[in-house]
């Protein structure tokens, strides 16, 4: 339990956080909860917007945390695999879906539509900020990983 003087609900408004266009292009990310906005935060939470036709973000996985998503709107193409690149799966996520991505699971997302925006809420569990999540970027493997399969 946190100390009494920290037991207050904190609200972070969208206008306080803005949009990060450089973190995982072409995604538009707004980081709402982290140790940058909440003293002592033990999770990272935010919103990701995928503009119509948005291609896949960089292929990656997290070594230090699980990730949860809630699909707010649209349809999102998700490609995942184990960290050794086996068991590759592709699925279309739809508004209302809850998604659990375990630590080590490779994942990328892209907008499945060329005409509609898509968005999701994400949460990195148990880490105070993005740096602590242990991102591993798979730059060399990206093009092959996201290529559609027959």
Task: Describe each PLM feature range.
Residues 38, 64, 114-116:
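Short strand-connecting beta-turns/loops that link adjacent beta-strands
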């Amino acid at each position: 339990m946190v100390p009494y003087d920290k037991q207050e609900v904190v609200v972070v408004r969208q206008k306080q956080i803005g949009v990060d266009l450089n973190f995982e292009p072409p995604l538009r990310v707004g980081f709402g909860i982290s140790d940058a906005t909440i003293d002592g935060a033990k999770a990272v939470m935010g919103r990701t917007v995928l503009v119509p036709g948005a291609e896949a973000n960089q292929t990656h996985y997290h070594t230090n945390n699980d990730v949860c998503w809630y699909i707010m709107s649209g349809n999102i193409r998700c490609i995942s695999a184990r960290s050794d690149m086996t068991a590759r799966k592709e699925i279309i996520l739809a508004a209302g879906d809850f998604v659990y991505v375990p630590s080590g699971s490779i994942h990328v997302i892209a907008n499945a539509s060329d005409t509609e925006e898509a968005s999701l809420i994400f949460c990195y569990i148990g880490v105070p900020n993005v740096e602590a999540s242990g991102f591993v970027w798979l730059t060399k493997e990206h093009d092959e990983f996201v290529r559609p399969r027959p």
